[in-house]
Amino acid sequence: MKFFALFIQRPVATTLLTLAITLSGIIGFSLLPVSPLPQVDYPVIMVSASMPGADPETMASSVATPLERALGRIAGVNEMTSTSSLGSTRIILQFDLNRDINGAARDVQAALNAAQSLLPSGMPSRPTYRKMNPSDAPIMIMTLTSDTFSQGQLYDYASTKLAQKIAQTEGVSDVTVGGSSLPAVRVELNPSALFNQGVSLDAVRQAISAANVRRPQGSVDAAETHWQVQANDEIKTAEGYRPLIVHYNNGSPVRLQDVANVIDSVQDVRNAGMSAGQPAVLLVISREPGANIIATVDRIRAELPALRASIPASIQLNIAQDRSPTIRASLDEVERSLVIAVALVILVVFIFLRSGRATLIPAVAVPVSLIGTFAAMYLCGFSLNNLSLMALTIATGFVVDDAIVVLENISRHLEAGVKPMVAALRGVREVGFTVLSMSISLVAVFIPLLLMAGLPGRLFREFAVTLSVAIGISLVISLTLTPMMCAWLLRSHPKGQQQRIRGFGKVLLAIQQGYGRSLNWALSHTRWVMVVLLSTIALNVWLYISIPKTFFPEQDTGRMMGFIQADQSISFQSMQQKLKDFMQIVGADPAVDSVTGFTGGSRTNSGSMFISLKPLSERQETAQQVITRLRGKLAKEPGANLFLSSVQDIRVGGRHSNAAYQFTLLADDLAALREWEPKVRAALAKLPQLADVNSDQQDKGAEMALTYDRETMARLGIDVSEANALLNNAFGQRQISTIYQPLNQYKVVMEVAPEYTQDVSSLDKMFVINSNGQSIPLSYFAKWQPANAPLAVNHQGLSAASTISFNLPDGGSLSEATAAVERAMTELGVPSTVRGAFAGTAQVFQETLKSQLWLIMAAIATVYIVLGILYESYVHPLTILSTLPSAGVGALLALELFDAPFSLIALIGIMLLIGIVKKNAIMMVDFALDAQRNGNISAREAIFQASLLRFRPIIMTTLAALFGALPLVLSSGDGAELRQPLGITIVGGLVVSQLLTLYTTPVIYLYFDRLRNRFSKQPLMKLE
């Protein structure tokens, strides 16, 4: 009593305490960072190694395997995958969520150093690593276009000036430049002219290398002057190389221009990029794992004026894609929902109390509780994100409950004519324990969430802590500020009060009287009520088993990624045309705003596209509906497939794939894997629960296999190295010399002219000059025939691996898809030597699915323990928890009604319902117990009176919680698909629970009272 009186009798101190909480919250809000979701990125490090000319199998066995053995010993690695392609290996290390990425990077460097002695000596450089996840969508894409500069020049500016500066920005992990390559002098040889002049390809290479050298020439010290010696030993343009003498034929010089076309071009002509239908160079910007997207994008945008100033004015530097606008729009929508929720909750209070002064009290208590939470969020290192703001939106209904319970009880005494000061003291004392029980038991629901491991635990930790802090502050405000304001603002006017609430009061009184009659019937027919309660328990089980489930709601971020997978033998020219065709099809869709893409590099049968959709206000379809509409049009393009997927804020795993979900096949025998992968892929492609089924197994690349006749070669005086050099000089885009410039280094690239590189019959025109000076055609000592060759070799751990990727059809669920995949594997009879397992998001989904029921049971057990401690009873917590089955039925039925799968967001809604619906029972049980202890009445009469007495606050708190969640259900802007499942679950659970628990709780109370009387004759103890 003295505790409450302290705050009621000292209004200045209480007001200043409230102001301190509010000011600290305002300061915390101004300092909080902004992000789409809590920081849940797995620490991922990518290791790269290269050995030019090595085929994929050689890279896998001689480079990837030794590195994997060393890297696999690092503590905290939970997944290691590698891809080896022509001349390069890329290893992706995914660490535990709790592992610090900087510490992991140090361990990776130590492992690379230890493995160095096991690597081939022909590697031009040591393996390197980057702190980045290659499967993560870029945070920004910039394009360079120009009417006056060539693609090579644009690439030069992009890589030399722009990429370097952007990569230095805090939060940026990597800047990939695509769409072309660095400028170079290209020497395009004519084999026929070389043969006629008697000049070998290697002689041309040696002549060019000897003519372009950069060596120190020294200096001369005269008597009074120091002279630096500098010669014109470098040739920097194609014009300078053309007159170069490469050979003498019968005393006549053979110049390079006589046997080759020498042009200023690019290092690798097999690269192409496009944006808005025209050639472009792309800057694809990725962030470090854990870096804040909004803050990183803002830093890059701040550098834009300086970046544009560093390049010529005739080069246009534009932002083609930016992930931040939809994130900001989504957060704006959540903030709008929060404001609407606060307004609706206060409206509920006004409708019931019909007093401006009384309504002012929760109108102050609710914002103070929410604003004060921002201070704790800042101290905990949280951010303003969709989940934390959703927690505050839902908290609106919770924090007002405490104020409503206190305010309504004080108002009841005021209506009875009690003086305000006495009414405030008496009212808060009567419900103080009730409010404390409701708040502590609600916070207890989140204890299992806080202890939950893995990504779901990390994801919802901010949600749980934010909501718990808001409830804690609300508890303090309700027991201090609320009674103080009631004592000083409200007046005791019973007659006037009756007049003010006459209209609504008559309706509420009629409802209350009807409830009393129906409750009296229920207490007389307890068996029927118990049948209803047991039926809800059974219905919960059936609904949970049957409802479709998914990991996380499919988000519409307004961004899509497309991956082109063409025939493995496709030429670059055809692949470039496929890119143009696909971009034209996608760009023509009315929902698409812009499309950029590029192809080329070491894997010529693949390409990437980045698609930005129009804002939601300008399109009617979701991103998934756009993908479904485009899927039919894209399927008509022969020889290639474009797989589209919507960019998500959460993506698990480091492997690059063409779709959102992965199923990985593992085998120690590569031959067995290559035998069974096509069978499994074909079976999965037939499943209606899956879409866009594809594989990363690339073992059908076209290869022209040459067989040397070594005896003939020995007789002709030709060794294998000369033959290999011939092929490399002709078809390898061989970099034979370096041109040094102040800001960069450029290459002289040699190969045969394009008309020869695009025709297999050009092999007939190749020749070498032996030691006798004779021109020997390649066909004299070699035969060739078409064959298949792997374009890439994949590992997971130390096993050969092949990942089958898939998307979900529109309306499909991940639970149905994973179950269908498992059935297909069983029906196929895949041998034990080939193992299958889900990877990435699908793997985390399965792990989460196994723990969902345990999490719910743990939450219920925790609440039971807390209530048992508070009530010093084993029985009363069961009475209170009997409200849960009806809430579960309502939540699951609502999800079914809205055709929404059961996701992690819906799971959180179920957890919240455990905390919400028990409040009704707590208010009933508290007053019934007090009536039995002090009124010497029967259990039936006590629970009947308690139910009628607490009917108004029960309805008020339920409607407050319902209206607090309603804006989430009705939201339709950016990020609505993330908010709606939470709102649907809570509203559905509250509606059904409210209808049933008003009857089931009193009946359960009676049942347990009878059991207590049967097994114990001890009277109820009075707890002071």
Swiss-Prot record:
Gene3D superfamilies: Multidrug efflux transporter AcrB pore domain, Multidrug efflux transporter AcrB pore domain like, Multidrug efflux transporter AcrB TolC docking domain, DN and DC subdomains, Multidrug efflux transporter AcrB transmembrane domain. It comes from the Bacteria. It is a multi-pass membrane protein. It is found in: Cell inner membrane. The keyword Transport applies. InterPro entries: AcrB_DN_DC_subdom, Acrflvin-R, Multidrug-R_MdtC. Its main location: membrane. One of its GO terms (molecular function) is xenobiotic transmembrane transporter activity. Keywords: Cell inner membrane, Cell membrane, Membrane, Transmembrane, Transmembrane helix, Transport. One of its GO terms (cellular component) is plasma membrane. The chain crosses the membrane at residues 12-32, 333-353, 360-380, 387-407, 435-455, 469-489, 528-548, 853-873, 875-895, 897-917, 953-973, 984-1004. Signal peptide: none annotated. Belongs to the resistance-nodulation-cell division (RND) (TC 2.A.6) family. MdtC subfamily. Part of a tripartite efflux system composed of MdtA, MdtB and MdtC. MdtC forms a heteromultimer with MdtB. This is Multidrug resistance protein MdtC. The gene is mdtC.
